[in-house]
Every structure is written in C-alpha cells, then in structure tokens.
C-alpha cells in the first residue's frame, strides 16, 4: 500500500497524462514500424507463418526496432500496471488482490523486456524463458485484474469482463503452442494467428483501461 502511495506522489509531480497516453500506444507503434521495415526487406511475412518475435530477427532494421521497442515496452508496462493498481486501490479493491495482480503484471513486463534483450538468434532458450513469463504472467494478470474490477466500486461490469475476454486468447495460444512443442506441424498456423489476435485484444484492453483511468481522473 505504501509503495503505491509513494508512486502516486512521485508521478503527481509530472504531467503523467501525456506520458502514460504515449506509453500505452508504444508497443503497438513498435510492432507497426517493425512490420513495415520487415516487409520492405522480405515480403513473405504473414500472421499465419510468423510469430510476433520473428520481427526481432527480421531484416532491414526491423529487428532493432522490435528488440529495443520490446525493452522499452517492458518498462512502460510496469508504469501502466502501477497506474492501474493505484486506480483500483482508490476504488476500494482488496489490497491483497491488487498486489497479486501487479506482481503478475510485473512478471509479464519482465518477460517483454527479456524477449527484446534476448532475440531468438542470440539465445532461443532465454527468449523462450522470457516469452513464458509474458504469456503465463499475462494470463494471470488478466484474470486477477478482471476479478479486481468486478469487486471495485464505480467500475462497469463490462470493463471487468474484458479481462476474462483477453485471458481466453492467452489460453488458446498457450494450448496450441504446447501442441506444437510435441508436433511442430499439427497446429502451427493456428498458433501463429492466435498470437496476433491475442496481441490485438491485449492492446485494446490496455488502451481502453488507460482511457478509463483518464476519464476517472477528470471526474475526480
């Protein structure tokens, strides 16, 4: 509780609104620019044949944009989860539930940072380790933040349900990726495609929550 209070005091000294608004769009912009650069160098890229992290080993500078962007995004996401946690505490959500949600958000953010720090052509093992942090942490925080918002005062049930909606593609991706571990050809296209669906829905969830928090700050 004291940690979140000190964070709120620190960032109230800055114009946090502009910083966080840019931050939540940063991961999506990173992917977009990486995709453009990749396709300028190799037009074979497809959401059915490539994972997101293939951008980290791509041509034409797409790898640099993706990997540096991933590391910055990891830091940005920690700030997002801090903001969301402070927001929920003000809505009288259980501090234990908020702490658990933030812990898994932090774990997922570390995973994003690691995926940028260790692209597949440097260390596939460490890259996969970071990916595991991101996906399993993401599944957990979507569920936990969803439960937190369901119990919060002044937050719509629709917003709370969005966490469970995003948790579902996490499960789908993890399921098909595990199938591919044992049979590489059985569900490869579905695994690739489900990750892109997951990323799209997750970005919508993050941006939607940022706008919700901004709206709440204007009303208070």
Model-inferred region functions:
Residues 8-28, 154-161:
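Alpha-helical transmembrane segments and their helix-start/interface "positive-inside/aromatic belt" motifs
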Residues 16-27, 66-73, 101-108, 134, ...:
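Hydrophobic alpha-helical transmembrane segments of polytopic
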Residues 24-45:
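Alpha-helical transmembrane segments of multi-pass membrane proteins
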Residues 54-75:
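Interfacial helix-start motif at the membrane-water boundary
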Residues 82-107:
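Cytoplasmic juxtamembrane regions at transmembrane-helix boundaries
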Residues 105-150:
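Membrane-proximal helix-loop-helix units in multi-pass membrane proteins
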Residues 144-220:
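Terminal transmembrane helical module of multi-pass membrane proteins
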